[in-house]
Amino acid sequence: MENIHLIFKFLWYSILFCIWGVSCTSSGTYKKTQMDIYMQYYDFIIDSLSKNPNYVCTRTARQMSFTTDSVAYCHYLVLLAKAYMFKSEMDSAKLSMDRAEVFCDGAEPSPLINDLYAEIYNMRGNVCVRQGLTDSSVVCFQKAFDYRLKGSNRDMLHDISINLADAFVRTGHYDKGAMWYRKALSYCDSLKIPEEKRFPVYYGLAQVYMELRD
């Protein structure tokens, strides 16, 4: 039943997006890009990532077969890596990230490529966390943050800041953890993140202050 619901949801998104695209292109103001299609797909599929990673893998592989833009294709690869991680298939996740990174290494530097690097290193950091490689996770998250600053999409800076804070806390660097939690709060303010989504930051700060007090 869940898969049927997701299919109908995707069809509905597709119809709305096509109507919007036609109306915009007919007036000569907008033409749909492969990255637009990816972002539409990402918004549709992201809620299923933790609930049904098998479905995400299958559906994403199908989407990739229709993609002609290399940057969009690599974003699909990173999304595929996330799904593999939820399936605990770390080797497959690493392979997908490696393929995306090889493309980035050979591409002309640009904000879009920096966004892609940020996605890759944030994912690598998460994989390191799962494998208990705490110091390596700090390095990866720091690279993800630096690339995101040079990218075109800063909406995820608060998430990467939280990841960095968590990683520093795991290494026992509570002062650096507190600093990154405060940075995360600052980004939450600038991005107007709702209060109910800031709980990880408040919880992390509370834990750090308890550790520092002891």
Ranges and model annotations:
Residues 24-214:
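A "functional boundary" signal
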